[in-house]
Amino acid sequence: MSNITYEFNENDVIVNNNGMPCIQRPFDKEALYSLLDKMSKEQLDELIEDINDEKRLREFKEEKLKKVRSRMNRELKIYKQELENKKQRMKMLTEQEEEEEEEEEEPPKPKKKVINRKK
């Protein structure tokens, strides 16, 4: 890392950026150019390397996040399907039990005696 020192004003806002403190203030292009002009070639190379590393890290995190979201969506879809299947099975079992209860509740009808009369 480079040994660059920064000066902060009391008007600067310190915010938490993913666990790292970060200074927020209006962008001052002239101050940035002045800072870059004062940096040595090695410091500039380190800065460029840090920026590229940060970019690669961000891309890696985005790719990982996309894969995790995709996997979670698949798992959620499977889980929803399983719940729907269980719901259908429970519905079928309930209907079956109700039919069995209705059959049990119906008293057996007395059989009519059929008398064969001979003529």
From Swiss-Prot:
Composition bias, Basic residues: 110-119
Annotated spans, Disordered: 86-119
Listed Acidic residues bias regions: 95-106
Name by which UniProt lists this protein: Uncharacterized protein V5
